[in-house]
């Protein structure tokens, strides 16, 4: 893990982490904060350095200064700018409150929002909307960079381990943060089980494939089982109670509710460090809330809005987004030429919204097959993994 990555993660946890996640802060940083005022804020770090009591923290501050002098910025590493930073040049606290009430909790959220969305907020005039966009653009880098700089930023991305070395190798290290990974397949192919495993591995330290953050889990089918997290947490050396407390769970009951939950998710992620969002499954409610060809256009528009909101959360907070998807059988004449007539639902909207698409199939016993169907950087390949009591892993000798 690079020095830049270490600095970013440690600083994010000190500023936004709470509860048991503070235990993931390196021992020297955690101790320094406790010896200060005990609340882990960035102001305490500066105060400690100023008083001459923060030897290790002084080095951290110098490292931060060096990092700021380099080309890569914090936004590229998944950090975010608090929306309060917009309170300049005529933008008041009342304006910030209006933005928060409308679901915009970071400067990035304002910068990425279309102008017409800002104008729909009560009390935001055209002049104020322009001022908000200009100030957000000043804080959030949105211009051109060289391919070399972008390559450097991507080299700092974190990948979350799946619990299976075979699957991690297939994915180039694990599930990539900052993008959407879609898992599709029939029932009992391991999609939800992989989501349960990732809900735990996202909490483990970076040096063993984790993200040192919490998980936000949206369940649309009622398949989430906390008891599965207990055995998986024990496998990875985590306290089961801490692991459960670091998973924020919500059951979605309709497509509109599913979309509204992302507003609550944005607020939670602006207050604490998260490294993973799970939606299991993304299309289940759309299949029942929208029926027939007459509502197909409305369904796809709603789905596009939901997937765009997910991608914005990935962009703002640098989290990995994992969604599961169901399949449908093709009943047209193409079945005769296709050995596997099942395809993921959601159409082109779903296909274009997902960065990486993984197809899952059943195997022998507890074994499952995963295939890379679509990816901007991974070759088409497949691997075998297995599902055990302690989560997803590699097949064992007795199962082969």
Curated annotation (Swiss-Prot):
Residues binding ATP: 185-192
Primary location recorded for the protein, binned into one broad class: nucleus
Disulfide-linked positions: none
Keywords: ATP-binding, Chromosome, DNA damage, DNA recombination, DNA repair, Nucleotide-binding, Nucleus
An example molecular function term from Gene Ontology annotations: ATP-dependent activity, acting on DNA
Localization annotation: Nucleus; Chromosome
Organism domain of life: Eukaryota
Region named Disordered: 1-69
GO cellular component: condensed nuclear chromosome; mitochondrial chromosome; mitochondrial matrix; nuclear chromosome
GO biological process: chromosome organization involved in meiotic cell cycle; DNA recombinase assembly; DNA recombination; DNA strand invasion; double-strand break repair; double-strand break repair via homologous recombination; G2/M transition of mitotic cell cycle; heteroduplex formation
Xref: CDD domains: Rad51
Induction of synthesis: By X-rays.
UniProt biased composition (Polar residues): 1-34
Function recorded in the entry: Required both for recombination and for the repair of DNA damage caused by X-rays. Its function may be modulated by interaction with other repair proteins. RAD52 interacts directly with RAD51, via its C-terminus. Forms a nucleoprotein filament with DNA as an early intermediate in recombination.
Family: Belongs to the RecA family. RAD51 subfamily.
Subunit: Part of a repair/recombination complex that includes RAD51, RAD52 and RAD54. Interacts with HED1, RDH54 and SAW1.
Extra facts: Present with 6960 molecules/cell in log phase SD medium.
Protein name per Swiss-Prot or TrEMBL: DNA repair protein RAD51
